[in-house]
């Protein structure tokens, strides 16, 4: 990826990441350049367009929440490339970046209990599978022992490989970011320009004049830099620090290698998530957000690993054990516990991953625990009906069951490809990803594309209902003679009642528990009537936004006022008089880093967004000098998102 001078991030076929944080300010955004791979002083410098203000003429340009550091015109060399206003370069623009960021959350007891419950589900799933495999071996049933153990080993090895690969990527990225930051801050107290990744320079520009806000920011950064780099005053001290760092790195590598060799990578990540959450509660105000977001990212990683493990181990294990139960016409307690644990693990992984995705995204509202429980029940009952149908059909038609699975997988994969997902860079990598998601679609619904899912949900579950009905009917017609109707009819009732219950929970979730409100009863026309209604803004932000555009729209306001007097009604949009904005009448604004990324975030599926965020998160957390968490700002072509997430020219 290559960076531009305005801080936008372009994607290319490379793993390098470079971007520019846009620092918050009261009157104008200050751009702190990041020059990956360049020494201090030779890369991007602090930029400002000619004129010394937010706009060249010093007025007319309003930055809602003051996070966009672009000028009204690109006059002067090294300008940040802001959006031109309607009146041309001299008139300025009202480029808005309406902040969607939620208020800072804190790690709670419920978060800890949720993670501990996930650990318990994982132990119950894997533990019962291993116990059942040992039981099959002791009873001399080597074929069932081999199949049961095979799925356990397959899921565990796959998870450890992915987990260790992520550790190597994160650890190497963190080391490179730390080394680059140390090289760019040669002296204690210097204004640190964090260097992230590798790539081209972010741009060059003029030195920014000193302002009171910037002086306060530099003072706070200098204090933190001095506290972090106070031991770098002599060459001997730096050499000993390097030696200690190498020893520490070796110990970490050895520990992580042993953890993953003993198949404990997922458990380690769960407890590391709890540790980061506790640290976030015990840390000060400046470090609390950093540990909290590290915890959120770690939980997203381990949730994705759990999702991978369930569809490689729990799902085939569940079908296998149910087939054995139907073929032997007997149910042992251990077999029942194993099947139940696998089913719970499947539903838990899907619901937990959706929660982790929403928690790790600034542009999404967090999902409540009640909504997660409803999602768990939705997936639990629909997957239960699905696997029971598979077990019944496979007990009679083993060969045709394999043909059906392959055919269903091909159809689902073709459908996913038709949805035009954008997960990978190349076309063939995208097809491989769609094939993997097609395996998930054998058992349950998994959203792979942003946008309205009502039609796709209806099509998917309608197809699943038809398949379950056909497979159950074929089993009932061709079942073994020794299977009486006293067993067959209740089995069919369980299949259809379970599926119906899952659909009811799905409707409950979208009708009452969806984070964005009820999803039913909203037509596309009414959804576009007031696109900003679903995203409430702080009072001071909304007031300053309306006040900033009142001068540019005085003619429209006068015309609306005349129409209002004539019709005897108040205009819909009206600017309220407010107190003059003085330093004493408004609260101090916390400086914030905003990373603008020139990517269409909402075109990416949920899984791909997680991978994309993983490539950025370590670089984001490298801003140790920032008193508030950096915020990602993606480009979007939708009306609502373009008004509320990205720059819009008014």
From Swiss-Prot:
Activity regulation (record text): Phospholipid scramblase activity is activated upon caspase cleavage to generate the XK-related protein 4, processed form. Does not act prior the onset of apoptosis.
Record's keyword annotation contains Transmembrane helix: yes
Chain intervals with Basic and acidic residues compositional bias: 1-15
Modification Phosphoserine, positions: 200
Positions marked as site (Cleavage): 567-568
Renumbered residue ranges of the record's region Disordered: 1-44, 200-238
Name of one Pfam family that matches: XK-related
Chief site of localization: membrane
GO CC list: plasma membrane
Biased composition (Low complexity): 216-238
Listed InterPro entries: XK-rel (IPR018629), XK-related_scramblase (IPR050895)
Keyword tags: Apoptosis, Cell membrane, Membrane, Phosphoprotein, Transmembrane, Transmembrane helix
Membrane topology designation: Multi-pass membrane protein
Comp. bias intervals (Polar residues): 21-31
Localization: Cell membrane
Ranges that cross the membrane: 114-134, 144-164, 248-268, 306-326, 331-351, 365-385, 396-418, 428-448, 457-477, 487-507
Gene Ontology terms: biological process: apoptotic process involved in development; engulfment of apoptotic cell; phosphatidylserine exposure on apoptotic cell surface
Family, similarity comment: Belongs to the XK family.
Protein name (Swiss-Prot/TrEMBL): XK-related protein 4
Protein source organism: Pan troglodytes
Gene designation: XKR4Q5GH76
């Amino acid at each position: 990826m290559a960076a531009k001078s305005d801080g936008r991030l372009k994607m290319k076929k490379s793993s390098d990441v470079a971007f520019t944080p846009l620092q918050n300010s009261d009157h104008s955004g200050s751009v702190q350049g990041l020059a990956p791979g360049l020494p201090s002083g030779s890369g991007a410098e602090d930029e400002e367009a000619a004129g010394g203000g937010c706009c060249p003429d010093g007025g007319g340009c309003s930055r809602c929440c003051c996070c966009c550091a672009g000028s009204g015109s690109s006059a002067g060399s090294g300008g940040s490339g802001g959006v031109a206003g309607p009146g041309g370069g001299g008139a300025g623009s009202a480029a808005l970046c309406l902040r969607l960021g939620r208020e800072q959350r804190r790690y709670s007891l419920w978060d800890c209990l949720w993670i501990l419950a996930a650990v318990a589900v994982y132990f119950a799933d894997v533990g019962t599978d291993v116990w059942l495999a040992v039981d099959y071996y002791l009873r001399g049933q080597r074929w069932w022992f081999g199949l049961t153990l095979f799925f356990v080993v397959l899921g565990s090895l796959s998870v450890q490989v992915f987990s260790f690969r992520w550790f190597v990527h994160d650890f190497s990225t963190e080391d490179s970011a730390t080394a680059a930051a140390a090289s760019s801050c040669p002296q204690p107290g210097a204004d640190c320009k964090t260097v992230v990744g590798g790539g081209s320079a972010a741009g060059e520009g003029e030195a920014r004049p000193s302002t009171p806000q910037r002086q306060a920011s530099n003072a706070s950064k200098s204090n933190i830099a001095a506290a972090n780099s106070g031991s770098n005053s002599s060459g001997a001290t730096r050499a000993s620090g390097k030696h200690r760092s190498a020893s520490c790195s070796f110990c970490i590598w050895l520990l992580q290698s042993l953890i993953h060799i003993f198949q404990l990578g997922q458990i380690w990540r769960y407890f590391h998530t709890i540790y980061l959450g506790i640290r976030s509660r015990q840390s000060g105000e400046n470090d609390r957000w950093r540990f909290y977001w590290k915890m959120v990212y770690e939980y997203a990683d381990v949730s994705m690993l759990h999702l991978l493990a369930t569809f490689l181990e729990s799902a085939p294990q569940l079908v296998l054990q149910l087939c054995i139960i139907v073929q032997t016409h007997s149910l042992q307690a251990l077999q029942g516990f194993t099947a139940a644990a696998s089913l719970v693990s499947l539903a838990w992984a899907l619901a937990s991953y959706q929660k982790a995705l929403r928690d790790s995204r600034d542009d999404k509202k967090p999902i409540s625990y009640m909504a997660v429980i409803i999602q768990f029940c939705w997936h639990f009952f629909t997957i239960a009906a699905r696997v029971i149908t598979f077990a019944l059909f496979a007990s009679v038609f083993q060969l045709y069951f394999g043909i059906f699975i392959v055919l269903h997988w091909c159809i689902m994969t073709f459908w996913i490809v038709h949805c035009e997902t954008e997960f990978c860079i190349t076309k063939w990598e995208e097809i491989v990803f769609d094939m993997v998601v097609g395996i998930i679609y054998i058992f349950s619904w998994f959203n792979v594309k942003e946008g309205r899912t009502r039609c796709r949900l209806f099509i998917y579950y309608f197809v699943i209902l038809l398949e379950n009905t056909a497979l159950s009917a074929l089993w009932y017609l061709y079942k073994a003679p020794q299977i009486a109707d006293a067993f067959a009819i209740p089995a069919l009732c369980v299949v259809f009642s379970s599926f119906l219950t899952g659909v009811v929970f799905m409707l409950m979730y979208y009708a009452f528990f969806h984070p964005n409100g009820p999803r039913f009863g909203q037509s596309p026309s009414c959804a576009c009537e007031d696109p900003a209604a679903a995203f409430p803004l702080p009072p001071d932000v909304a007031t300053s936004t309306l006040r900033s555009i009142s001068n540019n729209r005085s003619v429209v306001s006068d015309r609306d006022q005349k129409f209002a007097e004539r019709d005897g009604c108040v205009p819909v949009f009206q600017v309220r008089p407010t107190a003059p904005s003085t330093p004493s009448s408004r609260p101090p604004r916390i400086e914030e880093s905003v990373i603008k990324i020139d990517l269409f975030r909402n075109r990416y599926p949920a899984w791909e967004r997680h991978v994309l965020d993983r490539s950025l998160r370590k670089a984001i957390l490298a801003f140790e000098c920032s008193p508030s968490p950096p915020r990602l700002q993606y480009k979007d072509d939708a009306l609502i998102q373009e008004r509320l997430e990205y720059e819009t020219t008014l």
